[in-house]
């Protein structure tokens, strides 16, 4: 069994310090913080704005597919950058490997465009393929399911009021500003 080195003491001190910091941050708010309960405390809020409407707002899912493709092709760009910084060290073998990699990327990109994965709505893909929906079958058009008519659906609650930004009061959607008449 070897003696404890200064490096071991540093690790032990670090673990003790982190543990103390975690316990401190969890217990001090319990001791010093006020405890109040009520209906307003149970309400969800986003950045201090009073919520409006229900939680069942349909948001467009079109961007998720593009985001996934962005992440995939962004990672490939990272690999290309790593190869470009070490191109002299890897030689012809690395060059050949990267050419195969780039060709695979181009094939994947052509496949993505050919399958219509970047087309915004499935109905456009069905029209391009010449597929007509069957009468009586459920319409599974994801673009129609996730579409919302306007931004007003997001900011107007069911009673037709627009929530105030920070006060919690509700302002009428149709309220007009006082006008001054000149005679």
Swiss-Prot record:
<keyword id="KW-0472">Membrane</keyword>
<dbReference type="GO" id="GO:0048038">
    <property type="term" value="F:quinone binding"/>
</dbReference>
<dbReference type="GO" id="GO:0008137">
    <property type="term" value="F:NADH dehydrogenase (ubiquinone) activity"/>
</dbReference>
<dbReference type="GO" id="GO:0005886">
    <property type="term" value="C:plasma membrane"/>
</dbReference>
<feature type="transmembrane region" description="Helical">
    <location>
        <begin position="63"/>
        <end position="83"/>
    </location>
</feature>
<keyword id="KW-0997">Cell inner membrane</keyword>
<feature type="region of interest" description="Disordered">
    <location>
        <begin position="160"/>
        <end position="183"/>
    </location>
</feature>
<dbReference type="InterPro" id="IPR000440">
    <property type="entry name" value="NADH_UbQ/plastoQ_OxRdtase_su3"/>
</dbReference>
<dbReference type="Pfam" id="PF00507">
    <property type="entry name" value="Oxidored_q4"/>
</dbReference>
<keyword id="KW-0874">Quinone</keyword>
<dbReference type="InterPro" id="IPR023043">
    <property type="entry name" value="NAD(P)H_OxRDtase_bac/plastid"/>
</dbReference>
<dbReference type="GO" id="GO:0050136">
    <property type="term" value="F:NADH:ubiquinone reductase (non-electrogenic) activity"/>
</dbReference>
<comment type="function">
    <text>NDH-1 shuttles electrons from NADH, via FMN and iron-sulfur (Fe-S) centers, to quinones in the respiratory chain. The immediate electron acceptor for the enzyme in this species is believed to be ubiquinone. Couples the redox reaction to proton translocation (for every two electrons transferred, four hydrogen ions are translocated across the cytoplasmic membrane), and thus conserves the redox energy in a proton gradient.</text>
</comment>
<feature type="transmembrane region" description="Helical">
    <location>
        <begin position="11"/>
        <end position="31"/>
    </location>
</feature>
<keyword id="KW-0520">NAD</keyword>
<protein>
    <recommendedName>
        <fullName>NADH-quinone oxidoreductase subunit A</fullName>
        <ecNumber>7.1.1.-</ecNumber>
    </recommendedName>
</protein>
<comment type="similarity">
    <text>Belongs to the complex I subunit 3 family.</text>
</comment>
<keyword id="KW-1133">Transmembrane helix</keyword>
<keyword id="KW-1278">Translocase</keyword>
<dbReference type="InterPro" id="IPR038430">
    <property type="entry name" value="NDAH_ubi_oxred_su3_sf"/>
</dbReference>
<dbReference type="GO" id="GO:0030964">
    <property type="term" value="C:NADH dehydrogenase complex"/>
</dbReference>
<feature type="transmembrane region" description="Helical">
    <location>
        <begin position="98"/>
        <end position="118"/>
    </location>
</feature>
<keyword id="KW-1003">Cell membrane</keyword>
<keyword id="KW-0813">Transport</keyword>
<feature type="compositionally biased region" description="Polar residues">
    <location>
        <begin position="164"/>
        <end position="183"/>
    </location>
</feature>
<comment type="subunit">
    <text>NDH-1 is composed of 14 different subunits. Subunits NuoA, H, J, K, L, M, N constitute the membrane sector of the complex.</text>
</comment>
<keyword id="KW-0812">Transmembrane</keyword>
<keyword id="KW-0830">Ubiquinone</keyword>
